Amino acid sequence: MVVIGLDVGYGDTKVIGIDGKRIIFPSRWAVTETESWGIGGKIPVLSTDGGQTKFIYGRYASGNNIRVPQGDGRLASKEAFPLIAAALWESGIHNDGSPVDLVIGSGTPLGTFDLEVKAAKEALENKILTVTGPEGEVRQYNVTRLIMRPQGVGAALYLLNQGIIEQQPGYGVVIDVGSRTTDVLTINLMDMEPVVELSFSLQIGVGDAISNLSRKIAKETGFVVPFDLAQEALSKPVMFRQKQVGGPEVAGPILEDLANRIIENIRLNLRGEVDRITSLIPVGGGANLIGDRFDEIAPGTTVRIKPEDLQFANALGYRDAAERSM
């Protein structure tokens, strides 16, 4: 029996595999008719229907025909299925052609939790997923159980398991800064249960900052910059059209504006409960960029997570929850 943690986000797909192996790739894929080659060699092409339909994924998928998830953690959607297949393939789990018994720990936002869990279990649980690789290798995965937790609970469970936070009176607020949304989950730290009325999703994410920086670079160079390059330019200067663009000095004001909008909306939604917050927990890719600002919401309560764990916090917690359920 193999247990993995899987976090299919709108921006990136994260996997915690065997021996804690960590995998991350952009959450996008595209149907392809031919094999392609990149600088590093042949681009991986997968299939989930015996080779009839082939697709590329992650950073290799580009152009006008790319497909992306409908939202975070929507595992039952047809847009997410190739990403799940790619995640399993990338994990390296296989058993010489015979099915591997697999338990998947994953999560989805609290607002649609029951609906998404029901759909995901119907789509994946007790099903054998067959993935064909670029050289015709076939790997099969028997999903014996799918353990789902609300998005954000995964991060809290991981931190609790690591001793970074403790069960205590008060609220823990997980702020997951994603590509398209910022999901806020408030947890009662005594019983680790979500506080539904203080949990919400903001239609604000790092993608807003990327789009703003992309427009700024386009105005400067006269060319539209690829999304991936604009994303990289948020944190460091990059070369584009033989010119150095982006970097902290250029992106700083854009990220400040993003942080201000998120903080203002969180304060508004938490209303008079801020005094009960004992742990603010920024996670997600955006937390690397603006996480330090969240201490303004409840000074002195921000939990510092290792930078390399920020993007994987939910997936780590999902895997832990799946292991505990066995």
From Swiss-Prot:
Gene3D superfamilies noted in UniProt: 3.30.420.40
Keywords noted in UniProt: ATP-binding, Nucleotide-binding
SUPFAM superfamilies: Actin-like ATPase domain
UniProt: ATP binding residues: Y10, G11, D12, T13, K14, S179, Q231, G285, G286, A287, N288, Q311
Any GO molecular function: ATP binding
Pfam families: ALP_N, MreB-like_C
Biological function: Polymerizes into bundles of filaments. Polymerization requires NTP and is optimal with ATP, but GTP, UTP, CTP, and even the deoxy form of NTP can also support the polymerization reaction.
Protein's name according to its UniProt entry: Archaeal actin homolog
Native source organism of the sequence: Thermoplasma volcanium (strain ATCC 51530 / DSM 4299 / JCM 9571 / NBRC 15438 / GSS1)
